[in-house]
């Protein structure tokens, strides 16, 4: 995967900035990493005169997100065809997303939102916590 492909795949999966890429990298690979947002910037932009080597674990993260994305989209399309969609909301933050859909725990809210865009969902509303949810 070259730098341009990596950038498009990151954007496709809701990782829009070098900081978001490194933050998610650290979620997946909990051991200490030597990489920072400057490295991620080079992974997505390359160097002016040549391609920049992308860390293999970063590529594996993109591949993992693509696999999850494909599975979620396929299942939701089946539910839509049956008239029983599961995903009906947009979320303003990860905690709300994770409380409603445990299958997205530790995934960025932008990942979920990008799936909604790809599914062509236009009738979504924002998810709001009820008072009961906040108290429990």
Q: Which residues does each predicted region cover?
A:
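Residues within the helices of the helix-turn-helix
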Residues: 19-22, 38
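DNA major-groove recognition helix of helix-turn-helix/homeodomain DNA-binding modules
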Residues: 50-71
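Recognition helix of helix-turn-helix/homeodomain-like DNA-binding domains
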Residues: 26-54
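Secondary-structure-rich domain cores
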Residues: 10-11, 22-25, 50
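A short, Lys/Arg-rich alpha-helix, primarily the initiator
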Residues: 1-20
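Helix-turn-helix/homeodomain-like alpha-helical modules used for DNA recognition
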Residues: 70-136
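Residue-level detector of alpha-helical secondary structure
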Residues: 44, 62-66, 77
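Alpha-helix boundary/N-cap detector
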Residues: 1, 53-60, 107-110
